[in-house]
Amino acid sequence: FIASLGAFSTFGIFGLYASLAPSFMGQMLPWHGPAVSGMSIAVILFLSAGVQWLARPLHTKTCVLWGLGLLALGNVWLMATTLSNWPVLFILSLLTTAAGHGLMNLAGIAIVNKVATPATRSGLLSTYLIVGYIGTIAPILAVGWLSDYTGLSWAIVAFCIFMSVFTSSLCWLAYQTPVIEPA
């Protein structure tokens, strides 16, 4: 449950950067163009992969707690960037989002592997990924719809508030959950 909702939030937060980067980065940063938006996405993915590699020895629950916490913080930084247009905050947002993204991807797959038996592994992994893919789609559609009424900046602020509260709540639930032993 927590792993799948973690995937939802992880994919949703990355989806915001990926799908709306050209639009909102043009408003927040003094630099423009496809290279800037492409660079932010590349930074998230490269740093995410690096964090996953470095975090391999960490306990899964540690990865979940830190990952969700960093995703919440990344949304706070992105909201602050949206309101202030300060590029340093955007860099902090990218770094914390990338670290949270990597930790949650590592932890999510690890949790699926821990709770699945050989007979249920493919179904559980598919379900986990489907929830993640819905997380890529639904929040972005909501931001697009909301931006028609409030403007893009306020839609991003609303997204950041929601995702910060959501990932913080998941972090608290994960903290309360006992450690999962392999099936």
Question: Whereabouts are the PLM-identified features?
Answer:
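Multi-pass alpha-helical transporter architecture, strongest
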Residues: 160-183
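Pair of pore-lining "gating" transmembrane helices in MFS-fold secondary transporters
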Residues: 1-14, 91, 95-96
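C-terminal transmembrane helical hairpin of 12-TM major facilitator-type secondary transporters
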Residues: 62-106
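Transmembrane alpha-helices of Major Facilitator/SLC transporters
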Residues: 36-60, 74
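Conserved extracellular-gate-facing transmembrane-helix segments in secondary transporters
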Residues: 9-18, 101, 136
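Loop-to-transmembrane helix entry
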Residues: 27-46, 123, 127
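A late C-terminal transmembrane helix in Major Facilitator Superfamily
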Residues: 101, 109-152, 159-160
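Small/hydrophobic positions within alpha-helical transmembrane segments
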Residues: 9, 39, 43, 47, ...
